[in-house]
């Protein structure tokens, strides 16, 4: 299956879950592309104690 994920927010939980979904999908042999739109382009710079976004992005 092919998935396209559009991230249009800089809310830590939403961004973390989007990349977690993408990583899990890749591990299950699906094709995944992520498009950052609007505030989503700030994803890599988001700091959160509860959600390790940088780790999820690196795993992706």
Region roles according to the model:
Residues 2, 30-33:
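Residues at the starts of beta-strands that form the adenosine-phosphate
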Residues 3-15, 41-48:
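Short, glycine-rich nucleotide/cofactor-binding loops
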Residues 14-27:
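Histidine-anchored nucleotide/phosphate-binding helix
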Residues 22, 32-38:
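Short internal beta-strands
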Residues 50-60:
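A glycine-rich helix N-cap at a beta->alpha junction
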């Amino acid at each position: 299956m092919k998935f396209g994920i559009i991230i249009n927010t800089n809310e830590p939980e939403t961004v973390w879950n989007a990349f977690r979904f993408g990583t899990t999908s890749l591990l299950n042999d699906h094709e995944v592309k992520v498009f950052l739109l609007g505030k989503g382009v700030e994803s890599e710079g988001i700091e959160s104690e509860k959600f390790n976004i940088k780790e999820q992005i690196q795993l992706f």
